[in-house]
């Protein structure tokens, strides 16, 4: 009698394992890892003008086609607030012309010779 029991139990076990294999298709997936994220460089922009940057402002900025505080800040490596004040000063002196005034962004362009007259 014992050999018959072994045969039945061994016959049942393969069926159980087969069912487990079929059902495990939609089981646990690998856990997603967190990405490190992008690291930005620290901007070390000037807070005040030095003589060289101030001269560069008067020489180069009026020649730009599109002048915004962000463009000036990036090219001259100065803070955005300083760039805003510098552009207001250039506008008052007539070196650049204001195109659009938005509540958060001001756009200027170079003053053409026809505008100065």
Curated annotation (Swiss-Prot):
GO terms for molecular function: structural constituent of ribosome. InterPro entries: Ribosomal_eS25 (IPR004977). GO terms for biological process: cytoplasmic translation. It comes from the Eukaryota. The keyword Repressor does not apply. Keywords: Ribonucleoprotein, Ribosomal protein. Residues 28-37 have a biased composition (Basic residues). Residues 1-38 are annotated as: Disordered. The keyword Nucleotidyltransferase does not apply. GO terms for cellular component: cytosolic ribosome; cytosolic small ribosomal subunit. PANTHER family: 40S RIBOSOMAL PROTEIN S25. Belongs to the eukaryotic ribosomal protein eS25 family. This is Small ribosomal subunit protein eS25.
